[in-house]
Amino acid sequence: MPRLSEPSPYVEFDRKQWRALRKSTPLVLTEEELIGLRGLGEQIDLTEVAEVYLPLARLIHLQVAARQRLFAATATFLGDQHPDRLVPFVIGVAGSVAVGKSTTARVLQALLARWDHHPRVDLVTTDGFLYPNAELSRRNIMHRKGFPESYNRRGLLRFVTEVKSGAREVTAPVYSHLLYDIIKNEKHVVQQPDILILEGLNVLQTGPTLMVSDLFDFSIYVDARIEDIEQWYISRFLAMRSTSFANPSSHFHHYAKLSDKQATLAAQEIWHSINLPNLLENILPTRPRATLVLRKDADHSINRLRLRKL
């Protein structure tokens, strides 16, 4: 049985307890598809998909169905017997740099889109709502890129509000990690999805006014020991010397020729001056707001989960 922490709004599971909740949900991903979803340095395999992500997809599927029934009941109360469209179900995925939240979001998108009841599943990252580099420089906050103030939070809130309100077409800016900037004149078009997954560092933040987290129907925080995340970040940084950094167009091309020692020192400097302070000050404090916390071990595997009951 899962462990109840009394008094607590959460119920905790180990992996064996959680995987039993998959029931008969079929595994619909292939190894080839999973390779395309797996982020650099991530170790996720089909066993983890079956034991962790399929129960999660089943839970969300049940909640989407319940939310659709609630929407229909409200429409009946209002006398609207033929509502134009159901309200999109919005999922937030948060966590530190290098913790694997992008892989979590992509795998979840692939699984949820297999259900006939909600085949249209869109994934948007908040990177697109970073201010362009020129604006960050104008505000003298280029060194704070990734911190809450570096995002166009009003634009992000407006985007999610319009999607949630059923707008036929909503656009989001597109960010290039290669160029380290917003791509001019390029947009991500979202057209009335059944489910919208919003992935980013700070999506669970709260404030004195309406925040994007207030519009979530379900939220996930990908968690791990800080020491492990730092090591994953450094390992990824070193690996990128022969992948994205090697591209002459990359903003970080100057890192491509660094030795292991030089690259490790550079990664540690970035981690301790930017990523760690942002994690401690802004990201980690939002963890209690998540509907579900996925806890990773040092080998990247998810072995503990904490689900909010209320």
UniProtKB/Swiss-Prot annotation:
ATP binds at G95, S96, V97, A98, V99, G100, K101, S102. Pathway: Cofactor biosynthesis; coenzyme A biosynthesis; CoA from (R)-pantothenate: step 1/5. The keyword Aminoacyl-tRNA synthetase does not apply. One of its GO terms (biological process) is coenzyme A biosynthetic process. It holds the Pfam family PRK. It catalyses: (R)-pantothenate + ATP = (R)-4'-phosphopantothenate + ADP + H(+). This is Pantothenate kinase.
